[in-house]
A protein has these predicted regions:
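C-terminal motif of bacterial Sec signal peptides marking the signal peptidase cleavage site
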Residues: 13-16
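Bacterial N-terminal signal peptides that target proteins for export
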Residues: 1-6
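Pocket-lining segment of extracytoplasmic ligand-binding domains
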Residues: 79-80, 154, 159-230
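Short, glycine-/small- and polar/acidic-enriched structural segments
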Residues: 20-147, 152-155, 171-177, 190-194, ...
Length: 230
């Protein structure tokens, strides 16, 4: 009898630890612009709000998770959202919140002798294979009056970029400003950032309307602003 009771209690405890199957699954990666969502999670507000934060190491993982039906919502840039909708006709995406506008948080770092954008000709540049990475690279090329054929472009997720730069596999890298100190310790200099592209890089909270109803969308916005005011 004691053994049966113990097993029953263990089963109840395990069931209690299972994620809510009805919770909205929001995909994100650790980026400063998404901090209110992480704060809400740390404060224990997400579960009571019917939200489950699903963290990925890179934006590429978030996009893959959304395409594969593992997410109902995500923190993305505007261009990534448009590319996601274009690549997945079964999604019915809606942007419910603009979370921030980049003003220096996305940047291009390079080592000497690269000091200007024009100096990038013939250099190896690392960039994450996302819509944001492609967009930022295209704007760099515009500003430098170069073409893609003038560079050697290597696809690198953010978490591999510092190591690649330190190993001298790349000469320049498009990345988040948060990677700056680690890159600068390896001799990199910031030569271009999103301050030169005002209003062009926008982070948003996007949902799939098939799985997130209007009431839940309002709750998501309220959760964000509650955390922002904390």
């Amino acid at each position: 009898m004691f053994r049966c009771t113990t097993v029953l209690l263990l089963l109840i405890a395990l069931l209690g630890c299972q994620p809510d199957p009805e919770a909205i699954r929001i995909g994100s990666n650790r980026w400063l612009g998404y901090a209110p969502l992480y704060l809400a999670d740390d404060l224990g507000w997400t579960a009571p709000s019917g939200v489950r934060l699903v963290e990925y190491p890179t934006t590429t993982g978030v996009l893959r998770g959304f395409r594969n039906g593992m997410l109902d919502a995500a923190m993305l840039t505007l261009d990534e959202t448009l590319a996601l909708q274009d690549s997945a006709a079964d999604l019915d995406l809606e942007i419910i919140l603009i979370t921030n506008v980049s003003a220096g948080a996305d940047a291009l770092f390079a080592r000497a002798p690269v000091a200007t954008l024009a100096d990038l000709r013939g250099q190896r540049i690392g960039v994450e294979n996302t819509a944001l990475g492609a967009y930022f690279l295209s704007r760099v090329l515009d500003q430098a009056q170069l073409t893609i054929d003038d560079l050697q472009v290597l696809s690198l997720p953010v978490h591999e970029q510092v190591e690649a730069f330190a190993a001298k596999r790349i000469d320049a890298v498009i990345t988040f400003a948060s990677e700056g100190p680690a890159l600068e310790s390896q001799g990199a200099r910031r030569i271009f950032d999103s301050r030169q592209l005002p209003g062009e890089i926008i982070d948003v909270l996007v949902v799939d309307r098939q799985w997130v109803n209007p009431k839940q969308r309002r709750q998501l916005r309220a959760l964000w602003f509650d955390a922002l005011r904390t």
